[in-house]
């Protein structure tokens, strides 16, 4: 499999450090509010990458953190008159409700920054001892210029970064580009004891510590949104590699931005959507499918019209699968069309896998999936039970990689007995060639909200949606 590595700006063949095992770290949310659709993109994209690795037989150690102490959290907690810990607990639970509905598999471990303070202090002390960090009035800063490779992820030199960066020009710093590893206690903020006085960790040190603690000093893949490349991921590399002398991550993967109606999503523009808002109105898998119909590195434009289109597309997959389940019950043992459908499915599955192997190209892969749905819909009525079962299994297999077709239940909605009795009466009328009566019953069923479909395998009844 080839993956685009931000560090080298090329697609590279992925080989894990340890055979059969992939170690991934994905930057998780700051839990001060409900996650928005911009947060949902890395969740869905890198969950899909994990699913594909697992499909290929790898064991995936997947770490996704929660940032549960940070300026936004402190401000909101103080505003609501609760502790940062209470705020974090509330929104971590809300996060899981949304992520579960999006079929995002739970991480192997989801460490919280506040539970790893001791290890953060130890790493900061190590950087001080090696001359990479210094203490000023209870704050600890990283000496950015001392790390010779600073800028290698964002592919900029120090001067370029100085010119374009949003840096804190504190008079305490030796250099404006130096960043905080530890922040001295301020009024109204949570604080922990340290060798430099009470305070709290900086954002960047949190991820370095959690990644190395649970995955080792060099990991296979570090991933997140492209907005994290600088300064967050650049700073993670600097402090981690300064401390260990080893490469921090072999592959750096970044997803593109989500825009709303071709504008950058922001609360101030009033074009801000939470995941909860969308999945309460639309099928959660429609949001997932929508995200995967674009290449993960490209910007993604979100609109209600596009999510509605994704929901219609998702319905086509569910309808195809449901139809296969129905046809299998009464299908013939063999058919002359079997080879044609099997060959089409095998070819499209191979193309799907090739697309996934090429830098997780879910945009192409979903295209092949819908071609497969069209082939199945065209030929299914005249295929054998064995071929229909084969089609159903492959459809389910590929959808599972994408994390869709997982909220399906064939008996999701039982057909009332009186409706089934009317269907049987209509069947008897058709057998007796009493087509006027059959049509009358069909119209009666329609008025009751049901449609009947006559197929070679029998009569199918569905609620009109």
UniProtKB/Swiss-Prot annotation:
Short motif ('HIGH' region): ranges: 29-39
Cofactor mode of binding and number, as noted: Binds 1 zinc ion per subunit.
Protein residues bound to Zn(2+): 27, 207, 232, 236
Annotated Gene3D superfamilies: Cysteine-tRNA ligase, C-terminal anti-codon recognition domain, HUPs
Annotated positions binding ATP: 267
EC number: 6.1.1.16
GO molecular-function term, one example from the UniProt record: zinc ion binding
Subcellular location: Cytoplasm
Known cofactor(s): Zn(2+)
SUPFAM superfamilies: Anticodon-binding domain of a subclass of class I aminoacyl-tRNA synthetases, Nucleotidylyl transferase
Biological processes per GO annotation: cysteinyl-tRNA aminoacylation
Keyword terms of this UniProt record: Aminoacyl-tRNA synthetase, ATP-binding, Cytoplasm, Ligase, Metal-binding, Nucleotide-binding, Protein biosynthesis, Zinc
Substrates-to-products reaction catalysed: tRNA(Cys) + L-cysteine + ATP = L-cysteinyl-tRNA(Cys) + AMP + diphosphate
Primary residence: cytoplasm
GO cellular component terms, semicolon-separated: cytosol
Short sequence motif named 'KMSKS' region, residue ranges: 264-268
Family designation: Belongs to the class-I aminoacyl-tRNA synthetase family.
Subunit structure: Monomer.
HAMAP family in UniProt: Cys_tRNA_synth (MF_00041)
Protein name as it appears in the record: Cysteine--tRNA ligase
Gene: cysS
